[in-house]
């Protein structure tokens, strides 16, 4: 959707405001089930890295729906709890697969060796990189040949793109690095969405638009300007 800066009209995407014809527009982001499904996938990928790579017991990981567009993940009883902002920054780079260097993943700048490249059975990021690069063991040899042929710089760029677009976990670095941040209490309402922050015992089945919505059957008068249909508590609302 778009919101007109001049008159405040909210409408579907277009180049000018349908009410006052102004081209001064703001784009509005409205989360949906597809958005939440994508975020859930990132959370599950994060849990895999925390448990498999960092050896954190899954019993010490708690997941909460933030009340808006994402989830909060809490880790307790872990040596990582004592990390400062700088160390958390290094951890963020690892989780998001940032600043990966080709040497770490098999490509030595001088005289690269085929045997040094990661294998699909390798643990941690080596295995994830191999799966992304080669897809299957049968394609590994041919893939390595192309990587060496393309050169060091191309491989470094490809690792960077993989971190941004595919295998890197999408988290909020500003939240993770801030050791003084105060988080919303579970059970409280998010002022942007009106949904509650809730603990998620089963994130794969969790539906925030049903479970975190606290409306009941009592009629409530509201003022709304929203040109799309949405669902809360399995009921349809809009467009308004």
Question: What does each model-identified segment do?
Answer:
Residues 1, 26-34, 214-225:
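Short glycine-/aliphatic-rich beta-strand segments at the starts of folded cytosolic domains
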Residues 4-7, 17-20:
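Short cysteine-rich clusters marking metal-coordination/redox-active sites
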Residues 8-13, 23-27:
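Cys/His-rich microdomains that often coordinate metals
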Residues 36-54:
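A short, contiguous, amphipathic alpha-helix enriched in charged residues
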Residues 58-86, 90:
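Histidine-centered divalent-metal-coordination microenvironment in nucleic-acid enzymes
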Residues 93-172, 176-179:
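Long, charge-rich alpha-helical interaction segments
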Residues 177-192:
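Catalytic cores of secreted or luminal carbohydrate-active enzymes
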Residues 192-194, 205-239:
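C-terminal accessory/binding modules appended to enzymatic or scaffolding proteins
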